Amino acid sequence: MKSKLTTLLFLFSIIGFSQEIALLKYNGGGDWYANPTSLPNLIKFCNQNINTTIKNKPATVEPGSPDIFSYPYIHATGHGNVLFSDNEILNLRNYMLSGGFLHFDDNYGLDEYLRREIKKIFPNSNLVEIPASHPIFQKPYSFPSGIPKIHEHDGKRPQAYGIFENNRLVFLYTYECDLGDGWEDAEVHNDPKEVREKALKMGANILNYIFNN
């Protein structure tokens, strides 16, 4: 555990020179590979607008791999089942407690499975709704109502849930908003420009928060 923490802190210390983010390849049958253009587009937007230097191509990492400690931000999405083994649960817990940040974006149909698995990772913590006053919604772009609605799905209000450890947000779950769809190439969903821009700006806020906290 100590060596993993040391490695992670070292990697975070060189963030000014190079940054890399990753997509989580999880088991369970859900389509972890959904939205293939979303992270590259978010990276491009951030590098052009908020002075990040993220590598253009995101990595792909499995939850049980020690490689997860190489990435300050790991993104996951999908429409179906998510399943973590005991080793993966321990590895993900250590990752987040050591300074890493995991973000699951519900692509519709993920909710019941993800809630079950997150409870295994943090059995003594509950997902709590993140208030609109939280810094993640404040800068560099302002979202006074909190997480934006990108795709309607069944019309429920968008919500951002989190797990906090020692007052630090370590896990983010974006529900009923579908940020990742908004990050995709314009022709994939034919979203209006302003909707895509709203999604990308919220994504930029997430990365800005991670790199500065």
Residue ranges and their predicted role:
Residues 21, 73-112:
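Short alpha-beta junction capping motif
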Residues 116-147:
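Acidic, glycine-rich loop-and-strand cores that form catalytic or ligand-binding grooves
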Residues 17-73, 77-80, 170, 178-179, ...:
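Aromatic-Pro/Gly-enriched surface loop or interdomain linker
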Residues 36-43, 89, 93, 111, ...:
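Extracytoplasmic/secreted envelope proteins and their assembly/folding machinery
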